[in-house]
Swiss-Prot record:
It comes from Clostridium botulinum (strain Hall / ATCC 3502 / NCTC 13319 / Type A). GO terms for molecular function: phosphatidylglycerol-prolipoprotein diacylglyceryl transferase activity. It comes from the Bacteria. Keywords: Cell membrane, Membrane, Transferase, Transmembrane, Transmembrane helix. This is Phosphatidylglycerol--prolipoprotein diacylglyceryl transferase.
Amino acid sequence: MNPIAFHVGNLAIRWYGVIISMGTALGLLLAMYNCKIREASYDEFINMFLIAFPSAIIGARLYYVIFEFEDYRDNLINIFNTRQGGLAIHGGIIFGVLAVYIYLKYRKESFFEYVDVAAPSIILGQAIGRWGNFFNSEAHGGPVTKEFISKFPQFIQNGMFIEGTYYHPTFLYESIWNFIICIFLVYLLKKTKKKGIVFMAYIGLYSLGRFFIEGLRTDSLYLGSIRVAQLISVLGIILSIFFIYNIIKKEKRY
């Protein structure tokens, strides 16, 4: 699989960056639609995005580097090279949400109103972004038989044939799951006015899918013998259930 999309002079533009940019652009278009559903300010959303996006990129990189520091110890300058991947979504979510919380608190705007609107866009970006992993030949699962992989389209078979072995296209599993979540979240955004429900549903549903898919991957980040993504996913599921229960319980009081 060729990771290079095209060249600008001597500069190679990788598919990874092109796909991340595409996911971001489509996420912003979806947010415009979702802001109308909730009657939220799209201008305020863009201001929030301009703070959240770089914060998320920094967080995603730092999170990855912390757990893979041995790969960078002897060449620290490579920490700043993200063109070949090395972004951990959990770090991006944590840093991005924290930046948004601080910004909206400063602006005296409702945190949950805007993260509810953002949730479908975030998961859409993740669904599209996983295809960047495909072109980088990363984030795949363990070895599979030719008979198993033959059930997938030919281009998936070709991309998952790495150094003489076929691998689970886990990027595809997560991408499909994320697209399903995106559709559900847009539906939920239309159906409920309870602030926080949509965002916490995003956290819970993404965590649920990621927990199972992570078990198939061969490139997981570890904390001792524990897959970090699975640990964070369990915490995400618990957190979402706790918040959704309390949001609904609070609404019933009034």
